[in-house]
Regions:
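Non-heme di-metal
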Residues: 2-170
Length: 170
């Protein structure tokens, strides 16, 4: 029994679907919203903890995306998750140097992903914004500037890798 919709009904359904997607697509990643502030951020203990928590969350996101992907895209996403985890460990070490305390952020919740390509797009944008944020932090970070610059370079490399994955999957 193959029932087809009349063209007007089909158009209404697609317009609802596309408008819902447009709302999701226009939401800026949290990191990008932080960049809207014009002042140069100061890298302190709270910034280190916040960045560490963001790295843990992104690593979880990449692991979840890897479960959805196939082939070389899956392998690349696993590498990206590992890269984020390693950068998180670096930030954890910086936090320990700054405070003498072990960084223990809340365990990140797995993301709700409905579309792999849209999630990759958001991850790409977040990596680009993360690279810019690290660059801004490095400008005022004193002894931690070199490490933050390296973390920013890592974010740029991850953004490029995400772009490569998108090229394959589209």
């Amino acid at each position: 029994m193959n029932q087809s919709m009349d063209p007007k009904q089909e158009q209404r359904v697609w317009s609802r679907v596309m408008s819902a997607q447009a709302v999701r697509c226009t939401q800026e990643p949290e990191v990008c919203r932080r960049l809207e502030q014009k002042d140069i951020p100061v890298f302190d203990e709270s910034a280190a903890m916040e960045l560490y928590a963001a790295q843990c969350s992104a690593a979880m996101t990449y692991r979840c995306l890897a479960e959805m992907a196939r082939g070389c895209a899956r392998q690349a996403l696993v590498r990206l998750a590992e890269s984020r985890r390693c950068d998180g460990k670096r930030l954890s070490a910086l936090y320990f140097v700054m405070t003498g305390l072990k960084a223990c952020p809340e365990r990140p919740k797995p993301p709700c992903v409905s579309c792999l390509n849209e999630a990759l797009r958001q991850a790409y944008r977040e990596e680009r914004c993360t690279a810019e944020l690290y660059s801004r932090y490095a400008a005022n970070a004193g002894e931690y500037a070199c490490t933050l610059e390296q973390l920013g370079e890592n974010a740029c490399k991850r953004a490029q890798e995400l772009l490569n994955i998108l090229q394959i999957s589209l």
